[in-house]
């Protein structure tokens, strides 16, 4: 696992957080996606956190693109102005599916390189994936990815609980 932090301060210039959407889903269906249970190994009585991975995957594909669209639509920007999309990197296949479903909501397809990825190098580093990825792109440490002042980006995540978040941000 990893950790990420962001320092926010009020400034008298354009940029920063333009809009955000956050939702927590607490119905009995979503709460059941995670549980604490005994190991599958008979000789081990320890308790482990278990996740219904397919259910989480389906939940993410259903809810994250909608949160991203709602967040972007309520900002003063459109899909063609988004330079990069940073999605929590739990699963590369899932992130690509989220990205494609998001663009499909606009009857569009994602441009090449709009979604930088580090999962093949860092794995799923928990809440650190988005801040780490953003930092790597800002510092031009990720080949073929960069940002400039004024660029519009989207941040998105899905997490245990179940929580969905999206932020429209201007660099």
Where in this protein do the model-derived segments appear?
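Context-gated lysine
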Residues: 10, 21, 38-41, 50-55, ...
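Short amphipathic alpha-helical segments, especially helix-boundary/capping motifs
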Residues: 40-47, 72-76, 107-111
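Condensing-enzyme catalytic core mediating Claisen C-C bond formation in acyl metabolism
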Residues: 1-58, 66, 158, 171
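Acidic-enriched, low-complexity/disordered segments with a strong bias for Aspartate over Glutamate
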Residues: 1, 29-32, 73-74, 95, ...
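Short, well-ordered amphipathic alpha-helical segments that serve as non-catalytic structural scaffolds
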Residues: 3, 59-75, 133-141
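Claisen-condensing/thiolase-fold acyl-transfer catalytic domains that form or cleave C-C bonds
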Residues: 65, 83-171
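Short, surface-exposed alpha-helical recognition segments that flank or form part
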Residues: 55-60, 121-125
């Amino acid at each position: 696992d990893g950790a990420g932090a962001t320092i926010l301060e009020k400034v008298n210039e354009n940029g920063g957080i333009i809009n955000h959407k956050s939702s927590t889903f607490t119905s009995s269906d979503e709460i059941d996606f995670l549980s604490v249970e005994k190991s599958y190994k008979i000789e081990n009585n320890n308790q482990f956190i278990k996740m219904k991975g397919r259910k989480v995957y389906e939940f993410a594909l259903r809810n994250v693109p909608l949160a991203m669209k709602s967040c972007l639509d309520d900002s003063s920007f459109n899909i063609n102005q988004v330079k990069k999309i940073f999605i929590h990197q739990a699963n590369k296949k899932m992130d690509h599916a989220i990205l494609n479903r998001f663009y499909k909501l606009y009857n569009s397809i994602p441009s090449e390189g709009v979604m930088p990825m580090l999962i093949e190098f860092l794995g799923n580093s928990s809440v650190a994936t988005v801040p780490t990825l953003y930092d790597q792109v800002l510092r031009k440490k990720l080949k073929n990815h960069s940002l400039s002042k004024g660029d519009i980006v989207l941040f998105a995540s899905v997490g245990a609980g179940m929580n969905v978040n999206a932020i429209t941000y201007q660099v």
